[in-house]
């Protein structure tokens, strides 16, 4: 049986753990004990912080693992690469970690390689904030957090200090990046990279709440774009993945396309996409199991992806921003397109990040995007 080590075991990883077990892998979970809800899907579980790299490496050597991953947990990627490199397993390199670990590092790399990216300022103190010269509106965000945490759109200079304070609270390093605001449509791109060759699997339409926090509310595949736009997106993303040295891993790229047709890379994670995009939507829309592909990649059993199906698929999230989704979920029997759902009938809380949700449903259709 192929032995797979998974770093991290919190709730967002449950879908990936379930799939790994369903595929017949021997799963070894390594994570903090607190919040390790994925423990039930492990053949073995070690309550070790992924920050203890040498201890994680010791366990992985003892377990004679065939591959290691953190699925969509970006903060664990340095440990994944550390262990894989020490054991001669498939992974990205330490240089890739250095280039991708912060939004600022990515901006610098894109700029150096002629890849379209918003103008930006790294802010490490209030003094630097006060000295900054920027064209408004801007986006203020932590350099090193995800899930829409700490992100604020600022229209005028008078709002910059409050947005900075919010971003600093969510930043592990206390650093903030202030970026040019790019108005336009949002997309994500899911890909697998093997030995430096990139395989684009799907392009996703993203619907957010907009300003001020840009919370993700819906995702739909395939994106409603022209063939020319799709080719431009694929070409730009492949160039960006190469620049960031993403050579042996899944990736999740966020991009924006403005009204003039100009494409900008917002950020790239050298990991699976969350929000059911990689775990479910790619499979529902293309027939290709991205989780299976990512595990095969990590364990040295990669096969070139073969896309043989074409369907429409998507996810709607139930939150204070979209309360009517709760009624759709409750009446799911009236909607044959719905293939999976979950609902929590606790009172809705004010949505300030992607974590503030009370449910979701997934759909698959051969008759176009499911419109409510």
Where are these regions (language model features)?
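ATP-binding N-terminal substructure of ATP-dependent carboxylate-amine bond-forming enzymes
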Residues: 1-95, 302-303, 311, 320, ...
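Peripheral (often C-terminal) accessory segments that flank ATP-dependent C-N-forming ligase machineries
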Residues: 13, 112, 129, 293-372
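Short acidic/polar active-site loop segments enriched in Thr and Asp
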Residues: 66, 174, 242
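Active-site nucleotide/adenylate-binding loops and adjacent lid/helix of ATP-dependent enzymes
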Residues: 100-177, 183, 194-196, 223-235, ...
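Protein kinase-like catalytic core scaffold
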Residues: 138, 199, 264-267
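ATP-dependent carboxylate/phosphate-activation module, predominantly the ATP-grasp catalytic core
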Residues: 158, 180-246, 250, 257, ...
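Flexible, glycine/charged-enriched surface loops at secondary-structure junctions
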Residues: 177, 248-253, 304-309
